[in-house]
Amino acid sequence: MPGVKAREQESFEEAYRKFKKQADRNLIVTECRARRFFEPMTEKRKKQKINARKKMLKRLYMLRRYESRL
């Protein structure tokens, strides 16, 4: 869990920004949104399959883009 100790010179806004940045890095908000509703394993697998396909297509695109420069 992220925690921020505010310094004497720091305003509340600065400390809040630091806390938000730490929470984003730890994916706390994203995980809470994902766990808000029950998701069956079939839906999880479907999402994983879609994400894997996107990742593969992106790599293929970057590889072809790089090869065209050679």
From Swiss-Prot:
GO BP of this protein: translation
InterPro entries, per database record: Ribosomal_bS21 (IPR001911), Ribosomal_bS21_sf (IPR038380)
Record's keyword terms, sorted: Ribonucleoprotein, Ribosomal protein
Superkingdom as given in the UniProt entry: Bacteria
This protein's encoding gene: rpsU
Family of the protein in this entry: Belongs to the bacterial ribosomal protein bS21 family.
Organism of provenance: Wolinella succinogenes (strain ATCC 29543 / DSM 1740 / CCUG 13145 / JCM 31913 / LMG 7466 / NCTC 11488 / FDC 602W)
Pfam family of the protein (one): Ribosomal_S21
GO cellular component, one term: ribonucleoprotein complex
The protein's name in its UniProt record: Small ribosomal subunit protein bS21
GO molecular function, one term: structural constituent of ribosome
